[in-house]
A protein has these predicted regions:
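Fe(II)/2-oxoglutarate oxygenase catalytic core
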Residues: 1-209, 213-244
């Protein structure tokens, strides 16, 4: 799916969008935040609920359930198409790309309580070393004060993982993970290994766009509902796209 990033979408809901461009960390990496993004949250929640229950993930560090969205999922796929079209001018403006292609899309819900996390799930992570890969995160159901935080690895000063520094990051991260307490839970703010450099609050119908190489983690309070019900748990739409 190719998307022209310079063409404004012909959507009536575009008028309600409230975009903000953040620059975070020492690298001043762009992060896009768009409030009131879709204007049709109840309809999207109904689409996600219709695809439940979501399957458990295998060989994936995401702390919960994820339902991939494909062409056969007509309503969900149409929503993803519209999301990409509406986000295109913001991606183009913030990251200076002419167009992009969708890699994958899914509905995701956090269901793993802090006590059951694996060591990698307790630390910030990155999605890709590809500088042209971007993550789009659409907050849908927000059961408690949560969000997304961005980090700098203290020992290496890495904020964005690239092919040039991924080996250094992984070596340090493995050593540090071995030192984490088994009951440390989800990272919250800064700790001895990672410094939080920015955070974005999870607000229903807020869209977050950032480079896949940025170190990040969900802000997941221990008191949050870890329900697998899309209307009760922390539900997001997660997209990965690549600039062409």
């Amino acid at each position: 799916m190719g998307r022209e990033a310079e063409t404004s979408p012909s959507l009536s809901l575009e008028r309600r969008m409230r975009p903000e461009l953040l620059r975070i960390g020492n690298e001043q990496s762009p992060v896009v935040v768009i409030d009131e993004f879709s204007g049709r949250l109840p309809e999207i929640l109904a689409i996600a609920e219709g695809l439940a229950p979501f399957p458990a993930l295998k060989n994936n560090y995401y702390p919960g359930l994820r339902r991939m969205i494909g062409a056969a999922d007509e309503a969900a796929n149409s929503y993803v198409e519209e999301l990409c079209s509406a986000a295109a001018p913001f991606i183009g403006g913030a990251f200076d790309i002419a167009d992009f292609s969708l890699i994958e899309a899914s509905f995701s819900i956090v269901t793993t309580p802090p006590s059951q996390l694996s060591p990698p799930q307790r630390a910030p992570h990155f999605d890709s070393t590809d500088p042209k890969q971007y993550a789009l995160l659409h907050y849908l159901s927000v059961p408690a004060a949560s969000g997304t935080a961005f980090y700098r690895q203290r020992s290496t000063s890495i904020e964005r993982v690239t092919e040039a520094n991924v080996a250094r990051f992984v070596t340090a991260a493995k050593s540090e993970a071995a030192l984490l307490s088994p009951d440390s839970g989800y990272i919250s703010g800064s700790d001895e290994f990672f410094e939080q450099i920015a955070s974005v609050e999870a607000v229903p119908d807020r869209l977050l766009i950032y480079q896949g190489g940025l170190l990040h983690s969900g802000i997941i309070p221990a008191t949050m509902s870890f329900s697998a019900d899309p209307r009760e748990g922390r539900l997001t739409t997660n997209l990965f796209v690549r600039g062409n």
